[in-house]
From Swiss-Prot:
Name assigned to this protein: FACT complex subunit spt16
Record field: compositional bias (Polar residues): 458-468
Disordered, as annotated region: 443-498, 755-774, 936-1019
Name of the encoding gene: spt16
Location relative to the cell: Nucleus; Chromosome
GO biological-process terms attached to the record: constitutive heterochromatin formation; DNA repair; DNA-templated DNA replication; nucleosome assembly; positive regulation of RNA polymerase II transcription preinitiation complex assembly; regulation of sister chromatid cohesion; transcription elongation by RNA polymerase II
Role: Component of the FACT complex, a general chromatin factor that acts to reorganize nucleosomes. The FACT complex is involved in multiple processes that require DNA as a template such as mRNA elongation, DNA replication and DNA repair. During transcription elongation the FACT complex acts as a histone chaperone that both destabilizes and restores nucleosomal structure.
Segments of skewed composition (Acidic residues): 938-994
C-alpha cells in the first residue's frame, strides 16, 4: 500500500455510526437480522482476484474505501478492534478518537506476539456474549487466516456462531448514500454507453458485412475498450469529473447467440461464431468499487413468435420496475412478473427465470437481496438492484435447424428504488422493439415479376404520402389507417346507440315550448288583514313599506297596496311647479325580450299599466322614486339569490368520532377559502364525512360521504401543489359562496436559497451537489405524494359504503385548452375529465355526457374547440377552446376509448339555438336522426376543397341568421335576409350544385384536378 492512501474520516464515522445504530436497534426488534450476536468477526486474508468481492472485503471498501488484506475486524457494542500489520496500521491511526472508539492492534513477524493479540481478541469475544457473528460463506485464505483459526478454534465450541451476512446487507450495503449512488450511476452510464455506442455498432457491422467472429473474440474487443479513456470522455451522459482510470470490469463481457444460452452470472463467451437470430449481450462495470450491470437481447430477423415473446418480456420488465418502490416487499416483484406471464402466456411460465434480480453495489450480486418469490425483505428508498427478466430455452418450431430452434431472452437494468418508483440508471441503452430489432434478410429477397406492377403502385402511393406530409401543419393529422377505420366503425355504433337511446328515453313525451322551460305563476300577498297596514297610511300619502316589500298608493281616498313584484319601475319628472311620479306595472305584451317573461295567472284579465301622481313636494317624490327603485333592486337580488340556492341542499349532521382521535391531514389549505386570512388547517375523517378545521374562530367545513360524487388525488409531479379534490353531488355553502368543488392542497415547493460563497458549496460544487439537490427535491415531493395518496385512500375506505373511490388524473393523455379564461392542462381520469390545478375548476362526469363535438377542425388552423353536450339537455354545453391541433388524434382516441360518441366540423356552432331545438321536441329530434346532422358535417370534409368552401359559406350564413335572432350581432343584414333565403332554398341549392359541376368539368379539361388546386391554395 502506497503513501497516497487517505481514508475519508467523515464517511468512515458516518457509516460506522449507522452500522452500530442498526445493530443496537436490532437488539430491541422482534425480527432480528443480527441473530442476537454480542460480537462480530470480519476476517480478511490474501486478496483473491478470482473471487474479489465478498462480504468481508466489501465491508473494507464500505468503511475504509480500500481493501486491507491480512486484517481482522472485531466489533463489540462498545469498541471496534482492528488487528493488522504496522504498515497498514499507520493509515488507520487517524480513525482513533471518534465517537465510537477504534482500537488498533499491530501484529509483527513474531508468531508469539501475533498469537497473544489473537488470544486477546478471543477473550473480548467471550466477554461480549455467547453468540458471535461470522461470515460462513466467505472463502478467504492465507497464513493470517490460518493463524487466527488455530487460536479461535479453542473457543469455537463454547460460542454459538450466527450468520451475519443478512445483517451486513441490511445495515451496510442495501441503502446507499449520495456518494455511493453517484458512483453506481456513473458505472451505469459507462455500461449504457459501451452497449449502445460500441457493442451495437460492432455487432450490426459484423452481421451486415457477413464477417465471421467468435463470441470470445468479440468479447475481447469489448474488454479492450475499457482502457480507451477517450471513448468514455466522449460519452455525453458522463459528468466532466468522471475518471476513466477508476473503472474496471465487474462481470463479463458475455456474448451469446446461435441456440446456446446461459443467463447466469457465471456464463462466459464461447468459441462459436456470432450468428443472426437472438443475440444476448451482458456485462458489468465498476466505478470506485461500485458495480452496475446491463443486459440486452437483440433480435436479428426475428420470427413473429419471437417478437411476441420479447413484447411480453418488455411488459413484464416494465411491471417489475413499477413495483420497485419504497415499502414494497421483495417477493411482490417476482410475483407480479410471474403473474403477468401466467395470465398472458401460461405456456412460458416454466421458461421464466427463477428470480428477477438481486441487490447490487460493492457486491455484484447480494445473495441476501435476491428478488424471488420467497424474499420478505422490504424495499427502501436508496436501495439499488439489478433487475433481470428472462425466458430460458424457448422452442421455435419455425426454425428447421434443431441446434438453433431453442432461444433465450433477457433484459437487465441497474435501478435505484425511489419513493414512488425506480430510477433506471441504464435506461440510455434502449430496450424497446425499435432499439433492439435488426432486419438484414429482407433486403436479399428478389422481387417477383408478377408483383412488379403492384410495387410501382405502392411506390406512387408512398411518394404521394410524402408530398402530403411535407407541411408541418399536416403531420399531426396523419394517423394509422387501420386504427382510424376501427375508430370510425366504433363511432358509427355509438351514434346509432345514442339515437336509439334517445328514442326510447323520450318516447311519448312532449318538449318545452320554444325550447324554454315555462315559468309558473307565483302568488304573492302584501297583507292578509287590514290591521297589518302601517299606521302612516292614514296620512294618504305614497308610502314605501320596506318590511312588506309593498308600495301603498292612495286611490280615491283609500290606501291601495301594490306588491313590488307587480311594479316594473318608477320615475320622477318635473313640470312647472309640480313633480310627477310615474309607477309602471308589469302586464302582458309589454315586450318581446328574453327578460320579459313574467308569468300571469289570467292573461284575459284587465291590467293596470301605470299610475301617475302629482305633487308640489319635489323632494318627497324624489325620495319615493328612489325607495321604489331600491326596493325593486332588492327584490330582484333576493329572487336571483333564491334561484341560485335552489340546488343547495341542507346536509345531514356530521357524526364525529368520539372514542378515538380522527385520522388527520395537517397543514393543508382550503379552496375555496374561508373568509379571512389564508392559513393552513387540517382535514379530519369522521364516521360519515370529512371536516376541515380552520385554526381561527373555530370555523369548519363539513362534507358528507353521501354527497361526494368524485374524489380525486393529484400528485405534485410537474405541479406546484399536491391536492385532494372533492366534487359534490349537490353544492354546499362555504361562507356566503355556493360551491360544488372543495379542494385540500399543500404547496410542493420550498424557498430556494443562493449558496454562492457558502463553504459547503465551495467544496461540493458540481455533479454531486446537483445530484443531492435533485434527490432532496424528489424525496420531498415523493413524501408529499405518499402522504396525500394514503389519506385519500383512507377517505375512500371510510366512505366505501357510499361508493367513494379515489380517482387519479392521467397526465400522459392530458391536453391543454381554455375551459374558462386561462389556458390550462386538462386531464382525463377513469370517470371524469378534470382541471384541478387552477380555479375555476373543471369536473365533467363522463357518464353525464351525451355527445362531444370537435369544432374548427379544418386545414390551416393550429387549434380546435371541444364541446360537451350533456344528457340533461337543459344544462348548458361545456366548451373547451383553443386545444392544439397536435392533440386532435389523442383526444379522439380518448373519447373513443371511453365510449363517448363524437363528431367534428369546421365551424363554431350556435349551441343555444341547437339546444332550444332539441328541448322543444326531443323525440322529434331523435326521430329525425338525432345528432347525425353533426356527423353529416364531418362526412362532407371528405370531398374536395371546393365542396368544403361552399359548405363553409352556407353554414356561415345559417349560423349568422341563428345568432342574430338570439342576441345582438354585427351581421344584422344577413339575419334580415334569412326569410328570403328560406323561400327559395331548394332552388338556389340546385343552382350552386350545377355551377360547381360545371367548374369541375372545366378544371378537368384544363388538366387541373382538385388535389392540385388544393396544393396551390395551400402555398
Amino acid at each position: 500500500m502506497g503513501d497516497e492512501i487517505v481514508i475519508d474520516k467523515t464517511a468512515f464515522f458516518n457509516r460506522l455510526s449507522s452500522f452500530y445504530a442498526a445493530w443496537k436497534a436490532d437488539k430491541r426488534s422482534t425480527n432480528s437480522v443480527f441473530g442476537g450476536a454480542g460480537s462480530i468477526i470480519i476476517l480478511m486474508g490474501k486478496t483473491d482476484e478470482a473471487n474479489s468481492y465478498q462480504k468481508n472485503n466489501a465491508i473494507h471498501f464500505w468503511l475504509l474505501g480500500y481493501e486491507f488484506p491480512a486484517t481482522l475486524f472485531v466489533f463489540t457494542p462498545e469498541v471496534m478492534y482492528v488487528v493488522t500489520t504496522a504498515k497498514k496500521a499507520k493509515h488507520l491511526e487517524p480513525l482513533k478518537g471518534g465517537k465510537i472508539p477504534v482500537e488498533i492492534l499491530v501484529t509483527t513477524k513474531d508468531q508469539e506476539e501475533k498469537t497473544r493479540l489473537f488470544e486477546k481478541c478471543v477473550d473480548i469475544i467471550k466477554s461480549a456474549g455467547n453468540k458471535v457473528g461470522i461470515l460462513p460463506r466467505d472463502t478467504t485464505t492465507g497464513p493470517f487466516v490460518e493463524d487466527w483459526k488455530r487460536v479461535y478454534g479453542k473457543i469455537s465450541g463454547d460460542v454459538e456462531e450466527v450468520d451475519i451476512s443478512p445483517a451486513l446487507s441490511a445495515a451496510c450495503f442495501s441503502v446507499k448514500d449520495t456518494d455511493e449512488l453517484v458512483s453506481i450511476r456513473n458505472a451505469s452510464r459507462a455500461c449504457s454507453g459501451l452497449m449502445s455506442d460500441y457493442f451495437v455498432d460492432e455487432m450490426s457491422r459484423l452481421l451486415d458485412e457477413e464477417k465471421q467472429m467468435t463470441h470470445k473474440a468479440l468479447s475481447m474487443r469489448i474488454d479492450a475498450k475499457i482502457d480507451d479513456a477517450k471513448f468514455f470522455n466522449k460519452l455525453a451522459k458522463l459528468p466532466s469529473e468522471f475518471d476513466p482510470q477508476q473503472i474496471d470490469w465487474a462481470y463479463g463481457p458475455v456474448i451469446q447467440s446461435g441456440g446456446k444460452y446461459d443467463l447466469k452470472l457465471t456464463a462466459v463467451s464461447d468459441d462459436n461464431n456470432l450468428e443472426p437470430g437472438i443475440i444476448i449481450a451482458g456485462f458489468g462495470i465498476r466505478y470506485k468499487t461500485y458495480s452496475s450491470i446491463i443486459g440486452r437481447t437483440y433480435l436479428v430477423d426475428p420470427t413473429k413468435s419471437q417478437e411476441a415473446n420479447y413484447s411480453l418480456l418488455l411488459s413484464v420488465h416494465e411491471a417489475v420496475l413499477k413495483e420497485a418502490r419504497d415499502g414494497v416487499v421483495a417477493k411482490e416483484l417476482y410475483n407480479k412478473a410471474i403473474g403477468i406471464v401466467r395470465a398472458r402466456k401460461p405456456e412460458l411460465e416454466s421458461h421464466f427465470v427463477k428470480n428477477v434480480g438481486a441487490g447490487i453495489g460493492i457486491e455484484l450480486r447480494d445473495s441476501n437481496m435476491i428478488l424471488n418469490g420467497k424474499n420478505t425483505r422490504v424495499l427502501k428508498s436508496g436501495m439499488t438492484f439489478s433487475i433481470t427478466v428472462g425466458l430460458v430455452d424457448v422452442e421455435e418450431p419455425s426454425v428447421k435447424d434443431k441446434k438453433k430452434n431453442v432461444y433465450s431472452m433477457m433484459i437487465t437494468d441497474t435501478v435505484r428504488v425511489g419513493e414512488q418508483g425506480p430510477h433506471v440508471f441504464t435506461k440510455d441503452a434502449g430496450i424497446d422493439m425499435d432499439s433492439v430489432s435488426f432486419y438484414f434478410g429482407d433486403e436479399e429477397e428478389p422481387q417477383k415479376p408478377a408483383k412488379e406492377k403492384k410495387e410501382t403502385k405502392s411506390s406512387a402511393i408512398a411518394s404521394r404520402n410524402v408530398t402530403r406530409t411535407k407541411l408541418r401543419a399536416e403531420r399531426p393529422t396523419q394517423v394509422n389507417e387501420g386504427a382510424e377505420a376501427r375508430r370510425r366503425e366504433h363511432q358509427k355504433e355509438l351514434a346509432a346507440k345514442k339515437t336509439k337511446e334517445g328514442l326510447d328515453r323520450f318516447a311519448g313525451t312532449t318538449g318545452d315550448d320554444n325550447g324554454v322551460t315555462q315559468k309558473k305563476f307565483k302568488r304573492f300577498e302584501s297583507y292578509k288583514r287590514d290591521n297589518q297596514l302601517p299606521a302612516k297610511v292614514k296620512d294618504l300619502t305614497v308610502y314605501v313599506d320596506h318590511k312588506a316589500s309593498t308600495v301603498i298608493v292612495p286611490v280615491m281616498g283609500r290606501p291601495v297596496p301594490f306588491h313590488i313584484n307587480t311594479i316594473k319601475n318608477a320615475s320622477k319628472s318635473d313640470e312647472g311647479e309640480y313633480a310627477y311620479l310615474r309607477i309602471n306595472f308589469l302586464s302582458p305584451g309589454q315586450g318581446v325580450g328574453r327578460k320579459d317573461d313574467q308569468p300571469f295567472e289570467d292573461l284575459s284579465a284587465h291590467f293596470l299599466r301605470n299610475l301617475t301622481l302629482r305633487s308640489k313636494d319635489n323632494d318627497r317624490f324624489a325620495q319615493v322614486a328612489q325607495d321604489i327603485t331600491e326596493l325593486r333592486k332588492n327584490a330582484l337580488r333576493r329572487e336571483q339569490e333564491k334561484k341560485e340556492m335552489e340546488d343547495v341542499v341542507e346536509q345531514d349532521k356530521l357524526v364525529e368520532i368520539r372514542n378515538r382521535r380522527p385520522v388527520k391531514l395537517p397543514d393543508v389549505y382550503l379552496r375555496p377559502p374561508l373568509d379571512g386570512k389564508r392559513v393552513p388547517g387540517e382535514v379530519e375523517i369522521h364516521q360519515n364525512g370529512l371536516r376541515y378545521v380552520s385554526p381561527f374562530r373555530n370555523e369548519h367545513v363539513d362534507v358528507l360521504f353521501s354527497n361526494v360524487k368524485h374524489l380525486f388525488f393529484q400528485p405534485c409531479a410537474h405541479e406546484l401543489i399536491v391536492l385532494i379534490h372533492v366534487h359534490l353531488k349537490t353544492p354546499i355553502m362555504i361562507g356566503k359562496r355556493k360551491t360544488r368543488d372543495i379542494q385540500f392542497y399543500r404547496e410542493a415547493t420550498e424557498m430556494q436559497f443562493d449558496e454562492t460563497g457558502n463553504r459547503r458549496r465551495k467544496h461540493r460544487y458540481g455533479d454531486e451537489e446537483e445530484f443531492e439537490a435533485e434527490q432532496e427535491e424528489r424525496r420531498r415531493r415523493a413524501a408529499l405524494d405518499r402522504e396525500f395518496k394514503a389519506f385519500a385512500e383512507k377517505i375512500a375506505d371510510a366512505g366505501k359504503d357510499e361508493g367513494v373511490d379515489v380517482d387519479i388524473p392521467f397526465r400522459e393523455i392530458g391536453f391543454t385548452g381554455v375551459p374558462n379564461r386561462s389556458n390550462v392542462l386538462i386531464q382525463p381520469t377513469t370517470d371524469a375529465l378534470v382541471q384541478l390545478t387552477e380555479p375555476p375548476f373543471l369536473v365533467i362526469s363522463l357518464n353525464e355526457i351525451e355527445i362531444a363535438h370537435l369544432e374548427r377542425v379544418q386545414f390551416g388552423l393550429k387549434n380546435f374547440d371541444l364541446v360537451f353536450v350533456f344528457k340533461d339537455f337543459h344544462r348548458a354545453p361545456v366548451h373547451i377552446n383553443t386545444i392544439p391541433v397536435e392533440n386532435l388524434e389523442g383526444v379522439k382516441d380518448w373519447l373513443d376509448s371511453v365510449d363517448i360518441a363524437y363528431t367534428e366540423g369546421p365551424l363554431n356552432l350556435n349551441w343555444t339555438t341547437i339546444m332550444k331545438t332539441v328541448v322543444s321536441d326531443p323525440y322529434g329530434f331523435f326521430a329525425d336522426g338525432g345528432w347525425s346532422f353533426l356527423a353529416a358535417e364531418s362526412d362532407s370534409e371528405d370531398g374536395s376543397d371546393e365542396e368544403e368552401e361552399s359548405a363553409f359559406e352556407l353554414s356561415e350564413s345559417e349560423l349568422a341568421a341563428d345568432e342574430s335572432s338570439e342576441e345582438d350581432s354585427d351581421y344584422d343584414d344577413d339575419a334580415s335576409a334569412d326569410d328570403d333565403f328560406s323561400a327559395d332554398e331548394d332552388e338556389s341549392g340546385e343552382d350552386w350544385d350545377e355551377l360547381e359541376h360545371q367548374a369541375k368539368k372545366k378544371d378537368r379539361e384544363s388538366g387541373l384536378d382538385d388535389e392540385d388546386r388544393g396544393k396551390k391554395r395551400k402555398r
